[in-house]
From Swiss-Prot:
The RING-type zinc finger domain is essential for ubiquitin ligase activity. The SBD domain (substrate-binding domain) mediates the homodimerization and the interaction with substrate proteins. It is related to the TRAF family. One of its GO terms (molecular function) is transferase activity. This is E3 ubiquitin-protein ligase SINA-like 3. It comes from Arabidopsis thaliana (Mouse-ear cress). Keywords: Metal-binding, Transferase, Ubl conjugation pathway, Zinc, Zinc-finger.
Length: 303
């Protein structure tokens, strides 16, 4: 009884997740279909496993007293219902499986403008969120806490943070100068004229040299922030070039989306698999400024 009380108390303490929910037509028994067609649920917690609190999904099991559990929890409790001690994990709750399968919820980004409806399961929701056009993006300025959909972020950056040295024009070479400061991550934000897309050039000092990456701040939605870039570094007669036919997209500037997750490759061995430019230390001058040139083009406009 102690376990039941604790579970109940924890369930009451949890904040209720309320999102617009509808039930779509699904096949099956008449009773299951009728429930699916007519019901509207607001408390999404009702569709969570009462033991682990994760979203329910087939197979869903119930004991003879009607208590339910997901398949993984049945194994964890050794097929003994924690509420009544009867066997659980042998009889499936088919109607509840039909209901869960039929539930369609609004995207978590609905309040920002997304109108997509997605099945109520972790896999579908995660898959949509990865490519949702309304995923929030963060202002790259270190002291700024602004977040918003990418179009609003671009307007915000133009209004609040624009400088004379941070513009770029597609198809033309622009200066990309970065201060190299020890192991600290340095970055430069470039914005297409007016309130256009934001491109971030990042560099850091690694064991093999300076690593430079170029990313566009944009959601991973198809057709948004689709750019290519060409980067050039010169030191006397020496020249290193880097070309990315498909610029990576990020939502937030951080070390995690820089070279920490990339496998270092010497510049002379760099191939199509590399997504950063490596500049050996012996090619650096004594100045603390890394002077490069960058040409950014929209996908499909490459020459």
């Amino acid at each position: 009884m102690e376990n039941i009380t604790n579970n109940s108390e924890r369930s009451l303490d949890r904040p209720k997740r309320q999102r617009p929910v509808s039930m779509e037509n699904v096949g099956g028994t008449a009773s299951g279909s009728e429930v699916a067609r007519s019901a509207t649920l607001l408390e999404l917690d009702l569709l969570d496993c009462p033991i682990c609190y994760h979203k329910l999904g087939a197979p869903i099991y119930q004991c003879d007293n009607g208590h339910i559990a997901c398949s993984s929890c049945c194994k964890k409790v050794k097929y003994k219902c924690p509420y009544c001690s009867l066997r659980i994990g042998f009889f499936r709750s088919r109607i509840l499986e039909k209901i869960v399968e039929a539930v369609v919820v609004s995207c978590p980004n609905a309040k920002y403008g997304c109108t997509e409806k997605i099945p109520y399961d972790n896999e579908s929701e995660s898959a949509h969120e990865r490519v949702c056009e309304f995923t929030l993006c963060y202002c790259p300025e270190p002291e700024c806490k602004y977040t918003g959909v990418y179009t609003d972020l671009y307007r915000h950056y133009h209004a609040e943070h624009k400088t004379d040295h941070s513009w770029f024009k597609c198809g033309e070479y622009n200066n990309a100068w970065l201060h190299v400061t020890g192991e600290k991550l340095s970055f430069l934000v470039l914005q297409e004229y007016e309130d256009g897309p934001l491109v971030v050039v990042q560099c850091s000092m690694e064991s093999h040299g300076i690593c430079v990456t170029v990313n566009c701040i944009a959601p991973c939605a198809p057709g948004v922030g689709e750019f290519s870039c060409h980067l050039i570094y010169r030191n006397g007669s020496e020249k290193i070039t880097f070309e990315s036919k498909k610029m990576n997209k990020i939502q937030k500037v951080s070390p995690e989306n820089h070279v920490a997750n990339y496998k270092p490759i010497p510049y002379y061995l760099r191939g199509e698999a590399s997504n950063f430019m490596s500049i050996p230390y012996y090619l650096l001058d004594e100045a603390s400024i890394l002077k490069m040139q960058i040409c950014i083009r929209r996908s499909g406009e490459e020459v």
